Swiss-Prot record:
This is Nucleoside triphosphate pyrophosphatase. It comes from Rippkaea orientalis (strain PCC 8801 / RF-1). Belongs to the Maf family. HAMAP family: Maf. Its cofactor is a divalent metal cation. The lineage of its organism: Bacteria, Bacillati, Cyanobacteriota, Cyanophyceae, Oscillatoriophycideae.
Length: 206
């Protein structure tokens, strides 16, 4: 059975680690797409467009390949949060987030350049944040972790300490829904096992 190259259009270490955890060692090619070009008040629409744009940007360079693009956003109390632009912004966001619940949207696009097919899906997970005092918020932001993450937290890192519970897909919060990836691959006619250990180490193309 033909197994195309699997390409990750992202520089996210968390997404790469998720793929490696399930036995996929992709070619890594960050798209460097300018996300500021896309504006929408609809978070689901926004992450789907951004994920698709990232994958489409690099697709011409990879014939007979599968290109995976993803994008995540957190919505808390009606506000859409991507990555914070500064420590001060991260602190302000956490003061809003703490003690409340948010909705984490992750857009997924898989482009099959051999079959000339593109599938776009969105994973949605509810996240419930712990109540935190100001010193704890400042200490977490000063660790640097929130500045690298959509929504100002990393569930797989220190941020997991401050999440009381989630409803939905755990890996979706980290940046890539593994069950959703399996479903998309099946829709394209592939089985996830085709891509296990297809490469011994990821090939970074920065």
């Amino acid at each position: 059975m033909f197994s195309p190259n699997f390409v990750l259009a992202s520089a996210s270490p968390a997404r790469l680690k998720l793929l490696q955890t399930i036995g996929i060692n992709p070619i890594v090619r960050p798209s460097h797409f300018d996300e500021s070009k896309i504006v929408s008040d609809n978070p689901r629409e926004l992450v789907e467009i951004l994920a698709k744009s990232k994958a489409q940007t690099i697709a011409p360079d990879f014939p007979e390949s599968l290109i995976l693009g993803c994008d995540s956003l957190l919505v808390v109390r009606g506000e859409i949060y991507g990555k914070p632009n500064s420590p001060e912004e991260a602190i302000a966001r956490w003061e809003t987030m703490q003690g409340h619940h948010g909705t984490l949207y992750t857009g997924h696009t898989l482009i099959d350049t051999k079959q000339h097919k593109t599938l776009v899906r969105c994973g949605i997970t509810e996240v419930y944040f712990a109540s935190l005092d100001r010193p704890t918020i400042e200490a977490y932001v000063n660790s640097g972790e929130p500045l690298k993450c959509a929504g100002c937290f990393a569930l797989e890192g220190k941020g997991g300490l401050f999440v009381d519970k989630i409803e939905g897909c755990h890996s979706n919060v980290i940046g890539l829904s593994l069950p959703l990836l399996r479903q998309i691959l099946q829709e394209l006619g592939y089985q996830i096992a085709q891509f296990w250990d297809s490469r011994s180490t990821p090939k970074n193309e920065y």
